[in-house]
Swiss-Prot record:
This is Probable ribonucleotide transport ATP-binding protein mkl. PANTHER family: INTERMEMBRANE PHOSPHOLIPID TRANSPORT SYSTEM ATP-BINDING PROTEIN MLAF (PTHR43023:SF6), PROTEIN TRIGALACTOSYLDIACYLGLYCEROL 3, CHLOROPLASTIC (PTHR43023). ATP binds at residues 60-67. Keywords: Acetylation, ATP-binding, Nucleotide-binding, Transport.
Length: 359
């Protein structure tokens, strides 16, 4: 049963009992990707696989090319080297027709919502259906009303973007991203402009959508609360390279200085106002810290916080079981701290110490 069936039958949107009828999201395989603008290198040799049907987060300081990476994944920008394999097609080498077909797999939530100011929320949400399908207006109405209800905007369809809050605009943008039933959803800094409470609601909404449609979701953000509690997998860009990408426990337990600094929001570390610092600046800041000067941020956060679950009444996230099977297979290749955190999560305990792993 599709969303629209549920809306049409009852007159209001209801959570789906299962994801039957929705294909699982597809994986994205990125190999050796390099992108420059003129003589300025943005990032180089980026290699990762975004697992199908799971939620992943890409972190990084401002200016590291996270949004450029998203635009490359959907073919809006063309890297000069590497490949991006989606559903068996390399979108860098494919024809324009093939790229058009691949783009139908995507839904994109842009950083500012990218709503048309002259259209109300109904017409904004209906726009992709009118542009890319031959559906009747009655069918379009069922889909639009159901997607707006899904993101908590039922009854607001006649409002214009200028009449609603930033959080509502983000949700409207998400509704529009969902109308074509995408298998991949890209979210470009969905928390931008939102307060912590609205960000928490949006995080829950993203997880519920993953439970509903089993789509592959990639979130670009520098919001640490999202990074710690939402994704199945995490990665980080810094100094034109991918620092790491893998199960969330790998990054959250990492001892890499740039990762620890970023996750704790402190001045001490490699990241500076212009992305990176020289050794002299780092030594000076460390001396100030040793002398008792506060380095900003929070106290060092240890451990891996629980991941957000789907709201009760939603379907079970199929991604959870797939991820568990996948990380069990790769467990022996991961750092010891990550292994301990994963075993704790898999067994529902907190009994594993790092020194016990591998014994």
């Amino acid at each position: 049963m599709r969303y629209s069936d549920s809306y049409h039958t009852t007159g209001r949107w209801q959570p789906r009992a299962s994801t039957e009828g929705f294909p699982m999201g597809v994986s994205i395989e990125v190999n050796g990707l390099t992108k420059s603008f003129g003589s300025s290198r943005i990032w180089e040799d980026v290699t990762l696989t975004i697992p199908a049907g799971e939620v992943s987060v890409l972190l990084g300081p401002s200016g590291t090319g996270k949004s450029v990476f998203l635009k490359s994944l959907i073919g809006l920008l063309r890297p000069e080297r590497g490949s991006i394999i989606i559903d068996g097609t390399d979108i860098i080498e494919c024809s324009a027709k093939e790229l058009y077909e691949i783009r139908t797999l995507f839904g994109v939530l842009f950083q500012d919502g990218a709503l048309f100011g002259s259209m109300n929320l109904y017409d904004n949400t209906a726009f992709p259906l009118r542009e890319h399908t031959k559906k009747k207006e009655s069918e379009i109405r069922d889909i639009v009303m159901e997607k707006l209800a899904l993101v908590g905007l039922g009854g607001d369809e006649k409002k214009f973007p200028g009449e609603i809050s930033g959080g509502m605009r983000k949700r409207a943008g998400l509704a529009r991203a969902l109308v074509l039933d995408p298998q991949i959803i890209l979210c470009d800094e969905p928390d931008s402009g939102l307060d912590p409470v609205r960000t928490a609601y949006l995080s829950q909404l993203i997880m519920d959508i993953n439970a509903q449609i089993d789509a592959t979701i990639l979130i670009v953000t520098h919001n640490i609360n999202i990074a710690r509690t939402v994704p199945d997998n995490m990665g980080m860009l810094f100094r034109k390279h991918l620092v790491m990408f893998g199960p969330r426990e790998v990054l959250l337990t990492s001892d890499e200085p740039v990762v620890r600094q970023f996750l704790n929001g402190r001045r001490i570390g490699p990241i500076g106002m212009s992305e990176e610092k020289d050794e002299a600046t780092m030594a000076e800041e460390q001396a100030l810290l040793d002398a008792g000067h506060h380095a900003g941020g929070v106290e060092e956060i240890e451990g891996v916080p629980p991941q957000i679950s789907a709201t009760p009444g939603m379907p079970e996230r199929k991604a959870v079981a797939r991820r568990q099977a996948r990380v069990r297979e790769m467990l022996h290749t991961l750092p010891k701290k990550a292994q301990a955190a994963i075993l704790d999560d898999l067994e529902g305990t907190h009994k594993y110490a790092v020194h016990e792993i591998g014994q």
